[in-house]
Curated annotation (Swiss-Prot):
Single-chain monomer with multiple functions. One of its GO terms (molecular function) is 5'-3' exonuclease activity. Residues 324-928 are annotated as: Klenow fragment. This is DNA polymerase I. The gene is polA. Pfam families: 5_3_exonuc, 5_3_exonuc_N, DNA_pol_A, DNA_pol_A_exo1. It comes from Escherichia coli (strain K12). It catalyses: DNA(n) + a 2'-deoxyribonucleoside 5'-triphosphate = DNA(n+1) + diphosphate. The keyword Nuclease applies.
Length: 928
């Protein structure tokens, strides 16, 4: 590690930091509308730097106005850069004034760039025996590094001495100019030699030396071991003029004529009154207070009155980072020494981004192809371990790479950020590595910030938060049947793609995390529910569930016969044969030949045959009823009875569903492959499918299900005395509701009245209208309205809750669960009545459904912790709606069921008791 000597000359690349701060910070303004974000970023960096190193001599160097000698050498130099934004230009003059008021010398020299001024001062100081610390984010400055000249990037806290330059760029400081001349520099529009990238440039320079040597001994190039070595000499010769032009453009001048010497760059005492006026004008309130208290700076060359004080960007502005993604500092690691050096960096990083690359999306069967890491914006590494295409270079073996990385990956204190880390955790588990230190998941950060703002995949988030279009997998792998798997992709493309994944993930975290920290409720959900749930879901997925394919096969054969019967019945009703699965043919039969009046139309103008429409038509016509039954059975057959046996993993003999935390608006989990949530709950067909979910030998299935959880949450949220009393006394809530609504003694309530009350109870949770209730109960609308009016008379707290929630939603634009999860409702003030009504229904339902989701997630976390600590023989194998399903050894059933029951009922406190019903059996149906 580089040791910074005492009292170095500090040279700050002001222009570099000005642009980086502009892109890193949000567009902050003061109350007068004047931009302040870039100023804030630069000043924050300067203050931290001066307070940390306490120099007696320093300078902040900016580019001067006008052209430089490089523009005369090459007319396209930096020509691709857009003009300086007006809101950045407006900050330059006040920033200069603040820098000077801080007591720091400020330099800008016409005809050259800030780099040249810094290079000249650095060499002068070195000759005088003074150590130099250059604060910059530009890679071309690496050419200035010597044992006495060090670079520091204060935005990422990265320090580069000679050894670190080699580790980062693959060449020593004295070859950095040659390195840039060969590969070019897209940020400055330095052309370089066409076809020479980072790896080729490194191979040339490491093999033979600098540009002069390459052109003096071209015959030796063909003997180097890199792709394209045999033709490289000719390519260099063809582009010799461009190479040497690039060399000139990349060379930092160290002989600029300056009016000041290093010894004259003394740090002065801050001009407190001037600083105070500027800070007040631009409303840097925290710093205003610091200046007034005499504790703005503490440097040896000045006399501030107080001890240094730590500051954080988060004190006044979101701690965000650059939105410009550059591939210049991505490396592909092919040797152990470089990997060990990177591991050392990762171990010191406060947090790092991490990603895996594989040959399949199925994390149970997938093989690890490589890993990528990022420790600072723009700096990332890819470690390939299994690329096996023709002529692929030698790589560190998968076993050796994981052996070296395992301590870091399993270190709880090494905080990791990823995008959908549940997948990466599963991949590593295939190789016996338990991923720990899972601190941040950008998919979940986005989801918790706003579940309905858009998609939460990395590509979408990069466009939304970073304004960056990522490299897509299709771009490097192709499409369709000829698509390559990741192990077949050339390292040059694979390395950039994989490193970008880690880099973008880190930058997304740095953008979103400050926003999340501002909101107590969402932050609580993220830290205490969603992130702890990641390893729990990963374990459930890996546990999988045992399926009996014979049960499903028999069921499928029965469904085939029943579908044939329904098809025959439909043909008889229609008076002709037609394809029941054809929407077009069904439209013709129903609305043309049978003369049924269409209820709705599709966006294309055709009469709708949706499930909702058919349900309404089925009240009056026989054919829609048959079609509905046919569709339901056909879906069960294709989705479950036929498909589930094909989903059995040959490696494990079990079915492994995938759970998704960031899909539903309200926080409910969803699942795919298979979708467990869509298995019918209350009919015989659903029971038959559940019978195929079986326990292995000597084990039984245990199911634990929250009873009427959303109604209990409604009672808690509404504080309605009638509901609270009914639940507290353990009454049948639907019978109790019927007694209240119909004014009857509890014991005289009929099953039909209970059914009506149940429809009201559950309907209100989902914001059902009188029209919807009428349709469900098949009664006149007026009668349904009467039932609802009676309900609200008997349970006035519920009506008050609904009205209060609607009002809060309109005022805030969102509603919250008990834990603070938010559901934003963009249509709550819509001029479109249907959209507004849907948003109002969602406003009423979301706090209940979302709170139920939070409760079962808390239960999963609590139960999993107990299982991991005390019950290794018990497996949690499924989560479906409000139910958790386990495999339990037959000798442990009673004790385990009792503890699960207790943990689930006590994971959250409501004003009404939570009730958990636990059952067991040889299969899921028996347990359920």
């Amino acid at each position: 590690m580089v040791q910074i000597p005492q009292n170095p000359l500090i040279l700050v690349d002001g222009s570099s930091y000005l642009y980086r701060a502009y892109h890193a910070f949000p567009p902050l303004t003061n109350s007068a509308g004047e931009p302040t974000g870039a100023m804030y970023g630069v000043l924050n960096m300067l203050r931290s730097l001066i307070m940390q190193y306490k120099p007696t001599h320093a300078a902040v160097v900016f580019d001067a106005k006008g052209k430089t000698f490089r523009d005369e050498l090459f007319e396209h130099y930096k020509s691709h850069r857009p003009p300086m934004p007006d809101d950045l230009r407006a900050q330059i003059e006040p920033l200069h004034a603040m820098v000077k008021a801080m007591g720091l010398p400020l330099l800008a020299v016409s005809g050259v760039e800030a780099d040249d001024v810094i290079g000249t001062l650095a060499r002068e100081a070195e000759k005088a025996g003074r150590p130099v610390l250059i604060s910059t984010g530009d890679k071309d400055m690496a050419q200035l590094v010597t044992p006495n000249i060090t670079l520091i990037n204060t935005m990422t806290n990265t320090i580069l001495g000679p050894e670190e330059v080699v580790n980062k760029y693959g060449v020593p400081p004295e070859l950095i100019i040659d390195f840039l001349a060969l590969m070019g520099d897209s940020s400055d529009n330095i052309p370089g030699v066409p076809g020479v990238g980072e790896k080729t440039a490194q191979a040339l320079l490491q093999g033979l030396g600098g540009l002069d040597t390459l052109y003096a001994e071209p015959e030796k190039i063909a003997g180097l071991s890199f792709r394209g070595a045999k033709t490289m000499a000719a390519k260099l010769e063809q582009n010799k003029e461009v190479a040497y032009l690039s060399y000139q453009l990349a060379t930092i001048k160290t002989d600029v004529e300056l009016e000041l010497t290093c010894e004259q760059l003394e740090v002065q005492q801050p001009a407190a009154e001037e600083l105070l006026g500027l800070f007040k004008k631009y409303e840097f309130k925290r710093w205003t207070a610091d200046v007034e208290a005499g504790k703005w700076l503490q440097a040896k060359g000045a006399k501030p009155a107080a001890k240094p004080q730590e500051t954080s960007v988060a004190d006044e502005a979101p701690e965000v980072t650059a939105t410009v993604i550059s591939y210049d500092n991505y490396v592909t690691i092919l040797d152990e020494e470089t990997l060990k050096a990177w591991i050392a960096k990762l171990e010191k990083a406060p947090v790092f981004a991490f990603d895996t690359e594989t040959d399949s999306l199925d994390n149970i069967s997938a093989n690890l192809v490589g890993l990528s890491f990022a420790i600072e914006p723009g700096v990332a590494a890819y470690i390939p371990v299994a690329h096996d295409y023709l002529d692929a270079p030698d790589q560190i073996s998968r076993e050796r790479a994981l052996e070296l990385l395992k301590p870091l990956l399993e270190d709880e204190k090494a905080l990791k950020v990823g995008q959908n880390l549940k997948y990466d955790r599963g991949i590593l588990a295939n190789y016996g590595i338990e991923l720990r230190g899972i601190a941040f998941d950008t998919m979940l950060e986005s989801y918790i910030l706003n579940s309905v703002a858009g998609r939460h995949d990395m590509d979408s988030l990069a466009e939304r938060w970073l304004k960056h279009k990522t490299i897509t997998f299709e771009e490097i792998a192709g499409k369709g049947k000829n698509q390559l798997t990741f192990n077949q992709i050339a390292l040059e493309e694979a390395g950039r793609y994989a490193a970008e994944d880690a880099d973008v993930t880190l930058q997304l975290h740095l953008k979103m995390w400050p926003d999340l920290q501002k909101h107590k409720g969402p932050l609580n959900v993220f830290e205490n529910i969603e992130m702890p749930l990641v390893p729990v879901l990963s374990r459930i997925e890996r546990n999988g569930v045992k399926i009996d394919p014979k049960v499903l096969h028999n069921h499928s054969e029965e469904l085939t016969l029943r579908l044939a019967e329904l098809e025959k019945k439909a043909h008889e009703i229609a008076g002709e044969e037609f394809n029941l699965s054809s929407t077009k043919q069904l439209q013709t039969i129903l609305f043309e030949k049978q003369g049924i009046k269409p209820l709705k139309k599709t966006p294309g103008g055709a009469p709708s045959t949706s499930e909702e429409v058919l349900e309404e038509l089925a009240l009056d016509y026989p054919l829609p009823k048959v079609i509905l039954e046919y569709r339901g059975l056909a879906k069960l057959k294709s989705t479950y009875t036929d498909k589930l046996p094909l989903m059995i993993n040959p490696k494990t003999g079990r079915v492994h569903t995938s759970y998704h935390q960031a899909v539903t608006a309200t926080g409910r989990l969803s699942s795919t492959d298979p979708n467990l949530q869509n298995i019918p709950v209350r009919n015989e067909e659903g029971r038959r499918i559940r019978q195929a979910f079986i326990a292995p030998e000597d084990y039984v299935i245990v199911s634990a299900d929250y009873s009427q959880i959303e109604l209990r949450i409604m009672a808690h949220l509404s504080r309605d005395k009638g509901l609270l009393t009914a639940f507290a006394e353990g009454k049948d809530i639907h019978r109790a509701t019927a007694a209240e609504v119909f004014g009857l003694p509890l014991e005289t309530v009929t099953s039909e009245q209970r059914r009506s009350a149940k429809a009201i109870n559950f309907g209100l949770i989902y914001g059902m209208s009188a029209f919807g209730l009428a349709r469900q109960l098949n009664i006149p609308r007026k009668e349904a309205q009467k039932y609802m009016d009676l309900y609200f008379e008997r349970y006035p707290g519920v009506l008050e809750y609904m009205e209060r929630t609607r009002a809060q939603a309109k005022e805030q634009g969102y509603v919250e669960t008990l834990d603070g999860r938010r559901l934003y409702l963009p249509d709550i003030k819509s001029s479109n009545g249907a959209r507004r009504a849907a948003a109002e229904r969602a406003a009423i339902n979301a706090p209940m459904q979302g709170t139920a989701a939070d409760i079962i997630k808390r239960a999963m976390i609590a139960v999993d912790a107990w299982l991991q600590a005390e019950q290794p023989r018990v497996r949690m194998i499924m989560q479906v709606h409000d139910e958790l399903v386990f495999e339990v050894h037959k000798d442990d059933v009673d004790a385990v069921a009792k503890q699960i029951h207790q943990l689930m009922e006590n994971c959250t406190r409501l004003d009404v008791p939570l009730l958990v019903e636990v059952g067991s059996g040889e299969n899921w149906d028996q347990a359920h």
